[in-house]
Amino acid sequence: EIPLIEEAAKAGCEYFCIDAGWYAKGFWWDAVGEWKESRERFPNGLKEVTDYIRSKGMIPGIWLEPEVMGINCELAKTLPDTWFFVRHGKRIYDRSRYQLDYRNPEVREYMTSVVDRLIQEYGIGYIKMDYNIEPGIGTEYDAESPGEGMLEHERAYLQWLDALFEKYPELVIENCSSGGLRIDYAMLSRYSIQSTSDEEDYRYYATIAANSPSGLTPEQSAVWSYPLPEGDREATVFNMVNAMLLRIHQSGRLDKISEEEKDLVKEGLDCYKSIRGDINKALPFWPLGLSAFDDEWTALGLGTEEKLYLSVWRRSGNTPCISIPIPQGKGKEAEVICRYPSFNTSTYEWNQVAGTLSVNFERENMARFYEIKLCKEN
């Protein structure tokens, strides 16, 4: 973790989240549930790492899956069935995990104690809450139907979240849910951030990123940016543009990429920080329509009263040029600048009469981020 922490700090990251596996030395999938650090993995303790994250000016975060216990979790073997979803008199499990029942106050108290320990002992300020099972139709225990048991569990879980945020108002909690599931506003009215996908091909992620504001607010839409050691500078730019108008989840082997790519990551994060104050008050628009995975060109815009921001991607095909309609700009003069990357040499031109921005991307898998200031009509 140390090399990644150092490079993340240099790039300008503000949080550093330790992902799954911190509680086990090896295979852990079916044994989760106690949420205690693995001394084999962290011989000097997890606190050594979280303290180091703090020393680099970042807030430490951690991965947690608070609604499940593995079937081989030692604690689960000692607990009564009232802690879990039950059907036909037996605990139900999916993918080798039991579903915890948050109607039970002991469950809520236990998971609150886990969060308390992570915050108070390790200084955790960010929790990536995952959820990787399908609990089925619900639980029959103490319910007239499985559906009633499910509904009351969900309500109890939301109340638990409310209590956490009341207790720790500065805590940031991400709704990961297996990479973009459970995107509903019962959840999103509480969670700080929503994962949009676990897509591992950054070229496809452009479509997910561009469409995400159709389902959730841009400032909650967490999008991965993960430049690869085998990539080039355009691949790094593509990654950064994917997340620029949303919520950047910076990832990738920042310790393995070239110095030029590191500089581009830092430049991208600096650019994002300079515009993120506008994101939560801007309205999204899709000048090329919603995106499909086989589209050659994709665009996402955010508009405020003062300016427009526009991310443009060329993914494939033999068409190096496109004119992007900006309806609110028709008949208006405009000042257009490429905000990212600073090395940009690809041409672009504003057409006042048509209200279009024409761009020329000389290769596939290119992306650019523009700022458009429309002049007020006389």
Predicted regions and their residues:
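Aromatic- and glycine-enriched glycan-recognition loops and surfaces
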Residues: E1-T78, W83-F84, E109-S113, E152-D162
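Hydrophobic, well-ordered secondary-structure elements that form the walls
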Residues: F16, I53, D130, I173, ...
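Solvent-exposed beta-hairpin/edge-strand motifs
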Residues: P327-F343
